[in-house]
């Protein structure tokens, strides 16, 4: 691929996990026929004062980190919803707010000091370059460009810590609302895998070299990639073949015909 074709590549590689992602029509409703042991819980930005409607984090200043959830396990995060003020100037922030690609989501499982998930919010939900498009898929949805939903199941044995950081150099995050649904579980099966998401970017892309999407160790399922590409050429950029190397292979087990 010629160097002058690509300006920037942003990738979120998602890997983990739990089999059974292929759901038959109506399967979700059939699940209601079985009483499960877990108990539904939620952590939200709701104001504890019932007479107030300030159900949000009002401001996240540049460089500031807020804890969205700190949950004792064992449990499974089932759904994350969030929304926040758009980046362009408006009555809330006349100078504009931080973009989705400047707001970083991190998730830590159990005793780990390193995040299993570390990615800009926009890219995690499938929207690269700070844009807020509408997106519909099984695991993530962006409604009307500003309501972010994630349905990936995220199990943890001891603790789940979810944070958000404003990495804009000079813009606030305004009116950050969130709702995190999870279940308290009596126990998790041994060797239940963790959900992980890895963010990478390259500017500019290097001529003649494969772009590394994911490098990971251990057992698990690779479940998908969000790739955002900005081209400096009007021509099609997607002729690079995707290649999968498993367990130290010298040649790829899977090689596609182009991205």
Regions found by a protein language model. Name each.
Residues 1-10:
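Bacterial N-terminal signal peptides that target proteins for export
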